[in-house]
Amino acid sequence: MSAKALFEQIDIKSAEIADVAQRLEEQAKSAQDPQGHIVELDTLRNDVNSIGGELTMLDAERLSLAPWEVEALDRTTTLMVDVAANAEKAIETFNSDRTHLWATAFPAETAKASSEADEVKTLVSGYLKLAKAREQEARLENSLRVGPQE
């Protein structure tokens, strides 16, 4: 899988993490049945782990990455460490006190994970847009050099 395709996957999954974490925060504040959180927490954990795997694959290819990809990798990795830490804290809080989540740090932990995942989404989306613009620029420059085809 290409680096760009991996970043596209990270873009999609970081948006899902942000959405899931936000739903968890809202559900915890409304004192809903905590059993409903289990599927969402699994999704959160799986998406965080999946992005971790994608970042590891990108890091293994670091020497062959474009400069923008290296920069995106480094910045995304830093943010995802924070997302993972807050997701893990939320899971630990959930496991320790499911019945009173609204009175624990769970809503704040999930809110923080959501906010940080949203930062990842914004960052990666920006890099992907920049890469697309650069590709279009290169194609245009190439077509100007070649001239009209007859």
Predicted regions and their residues:
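C-terminal amphipathic alpha-helix
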Residues: 1-34, 91-150
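Alpha-helical segments in soluble extracytoplasmic regions
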Residues: 9-80, 123
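Detector for Asparagine
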Residues: 46-49, 86, 95, 142
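Long, amphipathic, charge-rich alpha-helical segments that form helical bundles/coiled-coils
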Residues: 54, 61-120
